[in-house]
């Protein structure tokens, strides 16, 4: 048997971190077993589904390194891969269930069902459809049709039975059918509801394993009933734990925590995200001794559902930042500079052409922050002093360090910088010799220069900073205090 798994996002917005986590585990499972990973779109929300969101989902999954074997963009033997292009299939199987007696036409009005819900709520019991249309005679159906009522199709849930399945993550689960009301599979307008459409999709795409979030556990017995009614084998199910923030709440869209695109734009590396997310709910071999860093190849080779926990996992941004910083530091300086460039350009510090025209210098600038940043988005705030003509001055620091007392020292340093060989050792020798001659401490001499040329009290090494800012800019920035 060839393992076939799928991920089925809705193209109504950027793909959520939780959906990406589910996609990752499905992808790892498929690749580990030499199987197929299928991407399809649940796009029946016609008002909100957009082609541009499909492109965003494609891009974000590819950015992470998650590829698919069949999908809307590349096709495959079991397409189409959008639900809106599969409506004839749903109608075909709905008709089959209608003819076999597993579903029936329901003419109940919204008002009738709302009244039933209020009654159930008042009685303190969960709502279940009462079965008002479960056994209508042909004459009763004809009368409703004559009134102009358009029927939905409801599944006839058998009574007094137990649905059993062995969850690949949680073990045996049993659900009595008496706890499941007769459910709608097709709306009056001919559009399928989720549980019916997903079964038809999985059946016709030969899906063998369904790995998804624990929120789908209540859907599983409903879907098993549909599989059985259609006469198809039931796939194996595994339900993954929820993902929460450290406060055990949902990841926040407002804080830029919910969409994978947010992390991409904030300067996280795809390999760091992939590694970090693989550890949410899965324990790799060797974790007991602190093993946390795994390559994509190691993840594929070692992924096993037996090491997946049913407990919810905590998306700890601090740990992600730390892990991303480690991955950044593993990059060569050339690689780091290439990764940094788009963030520097988007911050308006320079154009790509300007950076590439002085690429060796640009790399030297990036070397000053290579060991300091945890995300690529942090880079501009550290390197703006090298790239901007004007700097923002910390007024408190200026009042403290740029006093009348520094003028003689600044005058001598500026004079020396005009003619000194422009190298870090020569600059350092010049400044230190003047400092020593004038009997100044490093704090009395170095910190004023740093504040004057960077506008702040913290920067990379002072002499490297002077060298990289450049002779002309350094002299311009020191001039007001000479």
UniProtKB/Swiss-Prot annotation:
Organism's domain of life?
A: Bacteria
How the cofactor is bound: the record states: Binds 1 zinc ion per subunit.
Q: Which positions bind ATP?
A: 253
Q: Which family does it belong to?
A: Belongs to the class-I aminoacyl-tRNA synthetase family. Glutamate--tRNA ligase type 1 subfamily.
Protein name (database record): Glutamate--tRNA ligase
Motif 'HIGH' region positions after renumbering to this chain: 9-19
Question: Where is this protein chiefly located?
Answer: cytoplasm
Q: Spell out the HAMAP family in the cross-references.
A: Glu_tRNA_synth_type1
Residues engaged in binding Zn(2+): 106, 108, 133, 135
Q: Which gene encodes it?
A: gltX
